[in-house]
Amino acid sequence: MFDVDLENGVSFRESKAFKPGDRAVVAETPWCGLGMTVCYDVRFAYLYRALAKAGASVLMVPAAFTRQTGHAHWHILLQARAIETGCYVVAPAQCGDHEDGRQTYGHSLIVAPWGEILADGGEEPGVVMAELDFSRIDKARGMVPALSHDRDFAPPAPLGLRAAGE
């Protein structure tokens, strides 16, 4: 959950209204597996890798990023999730100015497995569409087979204290 107190006195407390899920979900459809996530989840790359390994071809990321954070991170994070998994990313995004003063970024996106943005809804309400060619998933994963090369790592050993200049 996105709970944070910002320096300017603004606070966000998603935990007051929402309960976090306890498992990743891939929904099977007649067309493909949909990896189901929401908003803040996009910051946890391992979740998207797990969804792709479990059969997701399309990663769903509905979100309500603030205008400031969205401008800095939204496109980059979604493109990274597409590239590192070889999946399409479909990310509907809330936009506009809200009664509580919050401003959301918008830019509903559809991103291809190679990272290209296929559709960008901009900052106004609307609909975005793109054709998903599922052969591009195998092509992207064949060119960068990171999912098949992925493996678990032991935690890093703590660094010992070092003298200055070492």
Feature names for model-found ranges:
Residues 1-54, 67-76, 143-146:
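Active-site catalytic loop in hydrolytic enzyme cores
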Residues 5, 122, 152-154:
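Intrinsically disordered, low-complexity regions of eukaryotic proteins
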Residues 6-9, 17-21, 90-92, 109-114, ...:
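Short amphipathic alpha-helical surface micro-motifs
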Residues 33, 42-128:
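CN hydrolase (nitrilase-like) catalytic-core segments centered on the catalytic cysteine
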Residues 130, 135:
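Glycine-rich, small/acidic residue-mixed loop/short-helix segments
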Residues 137-166:
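A conserved C-terminal secondary-structure "cap"
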